[in-house]
């Protein structure tokens, strides 16, 4: 009522922009020991370890364990909180979960209230040469710092249309898609000696997702007038259309 200019009117608010990484209106905060109210009167309120917030929105939630305690306990804690309905309302904005002790870290996407946690999609971060990073300081610097944490949430997650569950890319998929997009941005199209490239890996490694994300990054960057996503099998095309 005090805002007579806008009271009763529709107001547009810009609360998140994946392109404004460490710049523009993006503001980053860390919330230590966030308190989660439970839906049950029997259960006590829960308290997490910490969250990364972008413009006040919780996007990455972390559970920590001391040295010698398996990160499986941190994963189980996250799964338990989700089963208790903790990540609802404002906390449903959490995109990525991280379970960490000083010697090991895994990260995974929030499957949402209707999804199921699948340990097969709990990933360890690795460097460009696919050497696993285990020390918490290395993981924090490479994955959880800005700009990488913002980029992971904004560019390297995929909403799977086939099951409605969010997917997050493995580290080698991130490096591949990023390098392909960078190569296109630096290409000199007037040069007649342009060469193509290919993504090679084993079955089940996520080549289709890497290809799709590469095409999406190139298209959104406006570095190419048109991007064609071509598949060599009808069933692969049908699957990709459903998923992406």
Residues of each region from the PLM?
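ATP-dependent helicase/translocase motor core
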Residues: 1-226, 231, 235-244
